Amino acid sequence: RSRQDKSVSRAEHDRIITLVNSLTDAVLSTDKDGIVTIYNAAAMSLLDVNAGIHGRHINDLLQLTTLQHQPLDVFRQLSRSPAIRVRDDILMLLKHGDKIRLEATFAPILGGHSAVADGYVLILRDITKAKSLEQERDEFISVVSHELRTPVAVAEGALDNARLLAQRGYTRKVYEALQEAHRQVVFLARMINDLGTLSRTERGLADAPEVIDQIPLVKQLHETYAPQAAAKPLAFNLDIDPQAGSVYVSRLYLEELLQNFITNAIKYTPRGAITLIVRRQQTHVTISVKDTGIGIGKSDLNKIFDRFYRAEDYRTRQTSGTGLGLYIARKLAQKLETTIHVTSRLNHGSTFSFTLPIYH
């Protein structure tokens, strides 16, 4: 009978160990004195150890602090928890000096009907990335709200001014006020379009990949944007390799990426020319948009793909923009499984390009 009970107990213990090891969160179980009795693979990974956890005191294993960097007595937190308690304001110092943000669940192990704990369970979850994304989201919403508020206020003021001027018969000044309101509405529309594109790329929404003959696509984009270029006036040239071939990608993402490059080139090229180039190199094709515009300074080159970043150059500041264009371009390139390459000299223009495999 005793042997059978031991066998059942052993099987139950093995089941618990298997269950605990299947969890992705770090689990550490202690006796009533804080000595570790059970732990899982995730705990070993978090602590960056191969062995030596069993039989050690929980306080010796974990160096935790609050967000205010106050040391946290782990065993005290466990022993003071009459019921399950969760905290997400905990930092853990790693061996190489970095810190991670943890969510900790403290729980007593109650034996039978006793209110006295036989031991404790600590569950640790790494929430560093989740909190970082949460902070990014909050910052994004804050910046977007500010960026949208400004043109709305300017447009509202311009329209109110136009109404007053109309009442007084100042026809020309009414036209100027309406022009300003129109500029702000166009800016708003562009930002909303950028936000829509960004949302699609971050959620992974796109047309299914298809075989795309590049020459008709590039010619169509040239035809679409030629009037905008001519209005500045700028020369808009095509330089297409007749052997460019086809690619197998999302048409939506490819068009939006090229539109992004072309509109940027038109915006930041006060005079000269823009050239849309398609070049084949054996198994790949490189598509480039080259301009003779204001160029990008060396100090800005590694920041231009950051969200809401705009170069400090006064000519950039004089040109309206959302600061989302190149950030979105990078996202689109990632969806197309390619990388954007930029070459630029201040006052001499820029070239933006990417490479795709030829579809056979």
How would you label these PLM feature ranges?
Residues 180-188:
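Short alpha-helical segment of the dimerization/phosphotransfer core of two-component systems
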Residues 210-213, 230, 235-245:
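Conserved catalytic submotifs in the C-terminal HATPase_c
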Residues 336-338:
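Conserved glycine-rich
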